[in-house]
Amino acid sequence: MTIRHHVSDALLTAYAAGTLSEAFSLVVATHLSLCDECRARAGALDAVGGSLMEETAPVALSEGSLASVMAQLDRQIQRPAPARRADPRAPAPLADYVGRRLEDVRWRTLGGGVRQAILPTGGEAIARLLWIPGGQAVPDHGHRGLELTLVLQGAFRDETDRFGAGDIEIADQELEHTPVAERGLDCICLAATDAPLRFNSFLPKLVQPFFRI
């Protein structure tokens, strides 16, 4: 796997600081599980953060703080799940959300053979899986906020470049594009958005509220 499109420094910093929403954190974590370069960059940021923590003066804990933390840890301890065969298209950070196989996900048809599955993340940002048949285009659209799209299988092209497995596209309000899945292998992506897309055609606008896109 040759990855050419990586997570930005700003996103990595926010991820390391724990300020990203769950949906965006899921996309970044999944990319890091595939990309040695970005994983090394994230490790360097963690090291810097740890060094700063060591230089910070200690703060006295309130009475009962330790007991509270230990109680939370006890609640989080669960029996290990039985071993299961991993789907190579669903790296570890994503596997907890989708189960054993991507085919078993509850997909919803959007039209033109395109399917989506919204994942159970908290907060206002939405994470979804997209399954786009080879050769199929996603309707042209712009963005009202940030959109991260990570390719898990296949590839797509738009007005900016080609994105293959492991690549991540970062789109903002400046980008309008028409992603087209390459012919052959279906393109499966993990995407996250913090605002509805801005479609240019009437039909996508009409169904947009029902599909939360």
From Swiss-Prot:
Sufficient to bind sigma factor and inhibit its activity as annotated region, ranges: 2-85
Record SUPFAM superfamilies: RmlC-like cupins
Keyword annotations of the record: Activator, DNA-binding, Metal-binding, Transcription, Transcription regulation, Zinc
KW Membrane (keyword) present: no
Annotated residues for binding of Zn(2+) 2: 141, 143, 147, 177
Impact upon substituting residue 35 to S: Loss of function; no effect on zinc binding
UniProt effect for mutating residue 35 to A: Loss of anti-sigma function
List of residues binding Zn(2+) 1: 6, 31, 35, 38
Required for response to singlet oxygen: region residues: 86-194
Mutant phenotype after disruption: For single chrR mutant about 12-fold increase in rpoE-regulated genes. For double rpoE-chrR deletion mutant no effect on anaerobic photosynthetic growth. In illuminated aerobically growing cells double deletion is bacteriostatic.
Domain of life: Bacteria
Induction, per UniProt: Induced by singlet oxygen. Autoregulated. Part of the rpoE-chrR operon.
GO molecular function: DNA binding; metal ion binding
CC cofactor: Zn(2+)
Cofactor-binding details, from the entry: Binds 2 Zn(2+) ion per subunit. The Zn(2+) bound by the N-terminus is required for anti-sigma function, the function of the Zn(2+) bound by the C-terminus is unknown.
Result, substituting residue 31 to A: No effect on anti-sigma function
Matches recorded under InterPro entries: Anti-sigma_ChrR, Anti_sigma_zinc_sf, ChrR-like_cupin_dom, RmlC-like_jellyroll, RmlC_Cupin_sf, Znf_put
Keyword Translocase belongs to the record: no
Self-association state and partner proteins as the record states: Forms a 1:1 complex with cognate ECF RNA polymerase sigma factor RpoE; this inhibits the interaction of RpoE with the RNA polymerase catalytic core.
Role of this protein: Anti-sigma factor that inhibits the activity of the extracytoplasmic function (ECF) sigma-E factor (RpoE), thereby indirectly regulating the transcription of the cycA and rpoE genes. ECF sigma factors are held in an inactive form by a cognate anti-sigma factor.
Domain notes: The N-terminal anti-sigma domain (residues 1-85) is necessary and sufficient to bind sigma-E and inhibit its activity. The C-terminal domain (residues 86-194) is required to respond to singlet oxygen.
Family: Belongs to the zinc-associated anti-sigma factor (ZAS) superfamily.
Protein name, as recorded: Anti-sigma-E factor ChrR
Source species: Cereibacter sphaeroides (strain ATCC 17023 / DSM 158 / JCM 6121 / CCUG 31486 / LMG 2827 / NBRC 12203 / NCIMB 8253 / ATH 2.4.1.)
Lineage summary: Bacteria, Pseudomonadati, Pseudomonadota, Alphaproteobacteria, Rhodobacterales
Name of the coding gene: chrR
